[in-house]
Amino acid sequence: MSLPKTPSTPLNSTSTSESKKLKVSVAKEGTRGLPELKEKKNMVDRSKLLPTSLQNEFIPKEVLLSLTYAANAGPCPENLLPPKKIKTPKGTLPRLVDHVWHHPVRRNKFKYLIDHPVSLTGAGRDISFLYDVTYAKGQTREKAVCPPHLARSLQSHDGVIVPHKPKTLTDTLIPEEFHIVSSTGVSGLECYDDKYTTLLTDSENRLLLFPSMKPNKRVEVAQLNDVMDTMLERAGVENQEYTGPTKMHKLLHILKKEQTIYNMIFHELIRQVSVDCADRGELLSKVRERYVQMLDQIARQMIDFYKDLVTQRVMDQRILEELYNFKHVIEELTRELCLVRAHDVKLTKETEKAHKDLAQALLNAEKNAKIVEEYHDLYTLQRERMENDMKKLVAERDIWSSATYELALKVIERNRVILARRLYLNEKGWNKYTKHFIILLSNKDTEDLALLQKLTQKWRNLVNKLKQEVEQMEESTSETLKIVKDGLIKWQEFFNEKDILSPNKGNIFNSVLLDFKQWQKILNEKKEEFTGDVLLSKYDTLKIIKHLQENWADIGLGIFNRHKSLEGEMPSERQYMEEIIKNIQKLYKEYEIRINGDNGYSKILPSLISSLDFCSFKLENLEFPDTPLEEWQEIDEKINEMKSHLDILLNLTGIVPQHIDVDSVSVLQAYIFNMIQQWLLKIGNEINNGNIELQHHMDELHISMIQWMVNLLILMIPNFTDQDCLLKLEEESAEKHDIGVARLELDAIELTRKLYQYSSYLSSCCKGMVTAMALSKSTNSHKNATEDLYEVDKLKKECYEWINTCSCLLSNIKGRKITLLTYEEIERLLEEEAVKEFIEPEIDESFKEDEEESKEDRKLQEENKERAEEQPSTSTEKEKLIRFIGEDENVHSKPLFETDVLSSWRESAKQGTLAQKYLEAMAVIEHMQEKLLEVENRARQAEEKFEDAYEKLHHTLIKNKDLEELVMTSRKESKEEKENQDEREVKEEEEQQEEEEVRSAENSSKSPKKGH
């Protein structure tokens, strides 16, 4: 087997190999080598024979080869493994292998020579693993003691010996003590048998020499001794020059050097001994092994000892640190104690000062307390005095009020002022109903405002949710468009940079076609978002938002309708709401445009998809490399067109076309939300102000009505003057009376207008609210559902009756008919009831002319009555009288057989001088009198029948109650009987089941007996 030469270390001649060996320093094995030999190397010419004296000074060739073969070993050629049947060429090795190594049996005897080779990697068997202190960058740092089997070597860095450390990751999270360190150590050499030779390699696949088995001379032993002395001397000089960071560094440095030298000398000595006697060499090798093991044990003991030493040193260092920290803490505490003492002294002074101030304040407080007690006594005395005065005043007021009340009753009875009482009751009823409806209106406004805030908040949440959905859809669409655009730009650049018509573009265009189809699929999905179910769901959400907005807008309109001004004008918040609704409609319009794609998406996306489809079709039908350049230009134009479309779509994302006058969504939406918030605040203020204003107007009307009634009573009661009173005073009192009546009339007209306006306004505000409440109560089958509606009518009736009573009183005082409200106003106030109320006034107006004509007849009759009163009456018969209720609700009396009022009409009718219209009126009146008598008779008969029917109904109700009680008792008894029967049936069934079980058990017991 031929061995090729290694390129790094050619070994084709003996001279070159020797020169290489002399150049190699022994430091690779841990020493500096022999300086004398290095100096003499350049002076000797190996080509010539040397004298014997000079030859004795050189190391023998075999010794030098055995010492330096490890350093000069070259890598083993790969063609040697596995071995081939080729002869090894000459000149590959420095010398021939001895014959003893070619025989496996004999080679095993000398195996100890190759089991312990010399190592240059620092894996020698020394005690350098004790080295635990590193010295890096001028700092000494202790390391954990490593076990001996790791066999860490020592390396020299700038004169400082540091342990070899394997490469580790600097950014690792694993602590250093858990890192795995691998070291191959010193392994034995391996032999490979060839057909023509035997090779020796180490663990690094380097080709080594077998130890020489030639006989040795005494000169070689002497020269080996000189080499050892020289190497030890050189090592001692280096050790003196070396200064490590610690003593352990220096000790380990010496041990490393010496052990390396001893290892080399031992190896050569064992070889020399083995040449003469193999057994003696083997024994010496065993002694060497034992020696190494002994050193290893000593090293282990030193490790334990050194661990204890290092631990104690660390503990001492920690104790020193703790002592230093303790001392530092004591200093800090002492300093703080001084500060606390100073602060304590300061606080003591401040406390003494505060104590003095407090004592002075206590003295002042005692003085002030005495003064306060005196003031309190004065206050109690004054309060008792005032309470006594108040009691006296209250007693006097009660006496005068009771006397005034009794006098008022007597005056009312004497002067028949019954209508004043009805005026007071009407005012009281009107005030009660007005307060009730103001409170009801305030509660309804509060509920509507709370509901309005809730609905607007829900509407805002839905709008924000819709905005997020639309923005997410637009963002995903824009990202997709960016991906498509980037892909188009990438492929277009690729096509423009390289030759697209080359024959090796087939695979590339397949990937392009896949990308185009994928983009087409994605864009179709985005197109479906603007049509179909997605669009319908967005429209449904928008419809819900619109419906919710209409609801809170209707509630706002209801509030505004209840809070109109007295003139019927809507509040300013109504216009503000209309402005909000206009902006909301703009927002809806913009959302619709963005949802359905009218901003350009729905038009550009289909054209973009068709362009992609066209490009895909072209790429599928292209034939390489025979495709004409025109088709590629057409595809390139389509790509440019698609890029422009994509740019337009990306610019349209989140906006609408410029020709539509719509603001940005975010700005417009924030503006609308702010307007709604301000609108709600304004509505709350309007509600509070409106209710306060209603209450204020009611109080003013209440006081004005009472004041007018008091003034009326004062004027209605006549002034009684003495006979001795002067005429001037009577004239002055009559003038004052006329002025008071005129002022009372003016006040009544003004008060009537205000009362009519306020009552109409309040009833119009509450009408819709009360109707809705009545409907909701009726649907829930609530009792008295229409009670509030009746109270609204009662409010209007009380207002009308007060005004009507006021007009009656003024008419009686003035002596002529006074109307405070027109027919249209009454119709607006009472609606359908005004016609019934105005039947009698219309009839009175039709007979005004008749009354004027009959005034003269009445005057004549009065004159006749006065004459009759002047003449003494001789008749003892009493005149029969009839009592009737007048318009003022007072009881009046008149003679039963009064002179006929229509006698003048009848006389003139007999004479034929009466006009035709009066004849018709007389006929109508007589007919009406007859009908009235008939109606009165029927009414009396109906009343009698009603009383009889009512008594019968009362008796039947009593009988029904008795019958119901009997029915209830009978039902209870029947239920109890049914329950008893059910219990009996259940018991009977249980007894029957028990009997059947007993019978079945007896039958089962009899059946086995029959079997026997």
Swiss-Prot record:
Mutagenesis / variant outcome for changing residue 95 to C: Found in non-obstructive azoospermia in one patient; uncertain significance
Low complexity bias: start-end ranges: 1-17
Subcellular localization(s) per the UniProt record: Cytoplasm
Pfam families assigned: Ax_dynein_light
Mutation effect (residue 82 to S): Found in non-obstructive azoospermia in one patient; uncertain significance
Region annotated Disordered, chain positions: 1-34, 841-879, 963-1012
Coiled-coil boundaries: 317-402, 447-486, 572-597
Nucleotide-binding keyword on record: no
Chief localization: cytoplasm
GO BP: manchette assembly; spermatogenesis
Effect listed in the UniProt record for changing residue 134 to I: Found in non-obstructive azoospermia in one patient; uncertain significance
Start-end of Basic and acidic residues biased regions: 855-879, 963-987
Effect of residue 828 to Q: Found in non-obstructive azoospermia in one patient; uncertain significance
Start-end of Acidic residues biased regions: 841-854, 988-997
Function: May be essential for spermiogenesis and male fertility probably by regulating the manchette dynamics, spermatid head shaping and sperm flagellum assembly.
This protein's name: Axonemal dynein light chain domain-containing protein 1
Organism classification: Eukaryota, Metazoa, Chordata, Craniata, Vertebrata
